[in-house]
Curated annotation (Swiss-Prot):
Keyword Metal-binding set for record: yes
Annotated organism of origin: Oryza sativa subsp. japonica (Rice)
Induction section of the entry: Under different stress conditions, such as excess heavy metals, heat shock and salt stresses.
Keywords recorded for this protein, A-Z: Metal-binding, Metal-thiolate cluster, Stress response
Biological function: Metallothioneins have a high content of cysteine residues that bind various heavy metals. May be involved in ROS homeostasis. May act as reactive oxygen species (ROS) scavenger in response to salt stress.
Tissue: Expressed in leaves of mature plants.
Disulfide feature: none
Organism superkingdom: Eukaryota
One Pfam short name: Metallothio_2
Name of protein: Metallothionein-like protein 1A
InterPro entries referenced in this protein's UniProt entry, alphabetically: Metalthion_15p (IPR000347)
Family: Belongs to the metallothionein superfamily. Type 15 family.
Gene this protein is translated from: MT1A
Amino acid sequence: MSCSCGSSCSCGSNCSCGKKYPDLEEKSSSTKATVVLGVAPEKKAQQFEAAAESGETAHGCSCGSSCRCNPCNC
């Protein structure tokens, strides 16, 4: 998934930035699924902060209306 600001301040080729996980859209199906839930190891505060700062939102860029970057300074 491309969610970065491209040329002309657009949101990427597939314009799906508003959806964090476009592959997981709700779809109607007659088949049953099994969901397995688990527990992840605890992260220390420093690890969490480093992970949060590494995302694209740290640059202040997100997809706004009409698939344009907001703000347009990426």
